[in-house]
Amino acid sequence: MNKQTVALALFAGWILAAEMANATTYKDIAGQWCGDVTDYVFAPDTLTVKFHDNRPANVFKITKYNYANNSVRINWINGVGKESDTVFAEFSGGKMAQQGSGDKPRRPFHRC
């Protein structure tokens, strides 16, 4: 094996390790997150939304977690039985953000 092949193999291994280190998993999103307007609690099958204005909490059924590099797309059933999805990303040091979509704003969260 020549030096160029070894260098290429080491580089490919480094890239793969870096991608794996950034991979998002359930442990990254599980548990309670606090935001400006709501707090979220992620469990394997449910998302609980707690409002800061004393409205009753909403509990939604999660049908699927889709993990990508530094994001999680959650498919869930809303209050009228329609499936919706929400993307959470920017995981770093106990922080994350619900990504904006259409008329819905980006919402930052931190671990409670």
Predicted feature locations:
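Extracellular/luminal ectodomains and secreted, surface-exposed scaffolds of diverse proteins
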Residues: 58-67
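Extracellular beta-rich ligand/substrate-recognition surface
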Residues: 51-55
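Short solvent-exposed loop/turn micro-motifs enriched in small/polar/acidic residues
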Residues: 26, 33-35, 57-58, 81-82
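Bacterial N-terminal signal peptides
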Residues: 9-17
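N-terminal helix-cap/turn-to-beta initiation motif at the start of protein domains
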Residues: 20-34, 42
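Beta-sheet ligand-binding and adhesion/scaffold domains
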Residues: 36-39, 48-50, 69-112
